[in-house]
């Protein structure tokens, strides 16, 4: 009888541990962004771009000085991410050249399963001008539902401190001018 109770308790505990994993899915428009922290970039240019101070070891997306943050979940080993890198760089340039978007829409990358060394190699190889953060243990990747890469999430940073997902999609985003207009609209610009 004690064995049956022990096995039942262990089964319930293991089932309870899997429920949050099963419930996690990709973010959807209209939802609040899942909570996570990122390391403060060592490079001053990256800190300046994000509008965060060099103080502290970590920051949250809500700390970024912007109306909207486009997050790219990527992997340096993903051939689709490699193919998409020049297009995302062109989007970055289009944002920086657009007076309405510059400083109000920011891009960051998160390297799912990638170390700091690996994301730096990716940045150098593909001339990525925006910060890319390591996620070596897939912590952030798991929180966003273990999406395939590249996966893009546009997050509106509201004045009241809330964050709302406005766009979440696997793969490329199509034509840059149309996508930038959609981002500007989501950002309230």
Go through each PLM region and give its residues.
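Bacterial N-terminal signal peptides that target proteins for export
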Residues: 1-9
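Thiol/disulfide oxidoreductase modules built on the thioredoxin-like
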Residues: 124-128, 136-186
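Conserved redox-active cysteine motifs that mediate thiol-disulfide chemistry
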Residues: 73-90
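Conserved segment of the thioredoxin-like fold in thiol-based oxidoreductases
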Residues: 97-136
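A short beta-strand-turn-helix
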Residues: 38-69
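Bacterial N-terminal signal peptides
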Residues: 8-17
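Sec/Tat signal peptide C-region and signal peptidase I cleavage site
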Residues: 18-23
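Short pre-active-site segment immediately N-terminal to redox-active cysteine/selenocysteine motifs
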Residues: 67-69, 74-77, 148
């Amino acid at each position: 009888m004690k064995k049956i109770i022990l096995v039942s308790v262990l089964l319930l505990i293991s089932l309870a541990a899997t429920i949050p994993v099963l419930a996690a899915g990709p973010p959807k428009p209209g939802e609040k962004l899942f909570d996570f922290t990122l390391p403060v970039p060592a490079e001053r240019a990256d800190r300046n771009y994000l509008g965060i101070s060099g103080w502290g070891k970590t920051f949250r997306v809500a700390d970024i000085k912007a109306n909207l943050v486009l997050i790219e979940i990527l992997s340096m080993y993903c051939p689709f991410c490699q193919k998409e890198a020049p297009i995302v760089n062109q989007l970055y340039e289009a944002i920086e050249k657009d007076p309405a978007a510059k400083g109000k829409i920011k891009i960051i990358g998160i390297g799912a399963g990638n170390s700091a060394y690996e994301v730096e190699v990716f940045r150098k190889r593909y001339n990525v001008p925006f910060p890319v953060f390591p996620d070596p243990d897939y912590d952030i990747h798991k929180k966003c539902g273990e999406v395939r890469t590249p996966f893009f999430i546009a997050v509106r940073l509201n004045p009241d401190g809330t964050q709302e997902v406005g766009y979440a999609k696997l793969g490329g985003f199509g034509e840059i001018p149309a996508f930038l207009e959609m981002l500007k609209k989501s950002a309230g610009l």
